[in-house]
Amino acid sequence: MFTWLREKISNYIIRYLHKPVWKYESFSVTSPEILETYLEPGDVLLVEGNQRVSSIIKFLTQSTWSHATLYIGDRASHHDGAPLNLIEAEADGGVKAVPLSKYKYYNTRICRPTGLDKGEITQLIDYAISRIGHQYDMKNIIDLGRYLFPYPPVPIFVRRRMLALGSGDPTRAICSTLIAQAFQSINYPILPEITKESIETCQHKYVEREIYHIRHHSLFTPRDFDLSPYFSVVKPTIEKGFNHKAIRWEHQKSSPEKNGAA
């Protein structure tokens, strides 16, 4: 009885949270064709969503980004041959592969891990692909249901703790935790906790060394890949050769007087 009621409430919240907001500004949309040119397997593609749930996540994380996907290249394809380049976790389908074109009208950002060899990238993508078909963590939906109001009264110092969403069940996932687990499977850092300890050398001197601690995957949010010092931000406009001198500004248009017109 309780399970049935919980599922009914979850489905209602899903429908509510996934309705688009009335205003979405596309400041920096990159076409799928250009994105695909500069994306590399293993890249994280962040998305600024246009749904109610996106607004909640952006508010709680104080970030532009509300969704995270993993670019897998040509490792998966639809039955009709259409490429499925991204792996993501969403409430309306669990973990699945989707085409890059799904986000052609959205603001996006490419975050790239550094120094991975081909074997590690393969292992990373294999991990994500092996999760396809896993259910979305519905406890996350219940958690987000607490923040249906546009601006919940959440103190800044507790926002991170409140975003420890989900049940922790390894067979269920949300977008950022799925990708965090994939990178943790190859021991690649995102935002680890770092402590220092003193060790004595053979010369009886003490030196400090840093110890990295893996944070629980449920604590990760999309913005962490943007903030991480271990991921570089790739901007296609810059990569393809940006020249600011080629821009024609409105205020620089030639006036009729300058052209000798009467």
Question: Where are the model-predicted features located?
Answer:
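Cysteine-nucleophile amide-bond enzymes
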Residues: 1-262
